Amino acid sequence: MTKVLVLYYSAYGHIEAMANAVAEGAREAGASVDIKRVPELVPAEVAKAAHFKLDQAAPVAKVEDLANYDAIIVGTGTRFGRMSSQMANFLDQAGGLWAKGALHGKVGGAFTSTATQHGGQEMTLFSIITNLLHFGMVVVGLNYGFAGQMGVKEVTGGAPYGATTITDGDGSRLPSENELNGARYQGRTIAETAKKLHG
């Protein structure tokens, strides 16, 4: 059975919701899916004062976990047009796996959130995808088979590089059904691709 890891960092729960949708899509394709989060780097008292969502069910990942999967789908909120420091710190620790070629040929993908429509979604996706390519992974985005990214009648996330959501500046906007459907579609597509490559 194809093994998929949905690896994420979520400060306020938006990416957690997207991660769950990505996992749903991968499971629809018959994959075995684990959802794990990267460690929080912000001191507990600061995170609490900033109202971070600290009650997330997903277990904390270990870097060595990455080698155990056929596909790894990475999600994090945007920080000034790039991935969060929490995710960058985690991926930076995968140098040993990189040196051994342990991630070569695995399928990867990225998803993200921003506060605004033009808040750096594509740049953040590229910052994740760059890491995946350096690891030797095969990257799968959110292709235009997902028609939900084609319309202009509603404010919505989604790009050919990966599923996205828009949170609003105060974080009050939760992922829309269309954005969650995009995440499901990407998760399903990545799982299907991994199955074709890895059996």
Curated annotation (Swiss-Prot):
It catalyses: a quinone + NADH + H(+) = a quinol + NAD(+); a quinone + NADPH + H(+) = a quinol + NADP(+). Its cofactor is FMN. Keywords: Flavoprotein, FMN, NAD, NADP, Nucleotide-binding, Oxidoreductase. InterPro entries: Flavodoxin/NO_synth, Flavoprotein-like_sf, Flavoprotein_WrbA-like, FMN_Rdtase-like_dom, NQO. FMN binds at residues 10-15, 78-80, 113-119, 134. One of its GO terms (molecular function) is NADH:ubiquinone reductase (non-electrogenic) activity. Disulfide bonds: none annotated. Substrate binds at residue 98. The keyword Nucleotide-binding applies. It comes from the Bacteria. NAD(+) binds at residue 12. Residues 4-190 form the Flavodoxin-like domain. One of its GO terms (cellular component) is membrane. Belongs to the WrbA family. Binds 1 FMN per monomer. Its EC number is 1.6.5.2. This is NAD(P)H dehydrogenase (quinone). NCBIfam families: flav_wrbA, PRK03767.1. It is an enzyme of class 1 (oxidoreductase). PANTHER family: FLAVODOXIN-RELATED PROTEIN WRBA-RELATED (PTHR30546), FLAVOPROTEIN-LIKE PROTEIN YCP4-RELATED (PTHR30546:SF23).
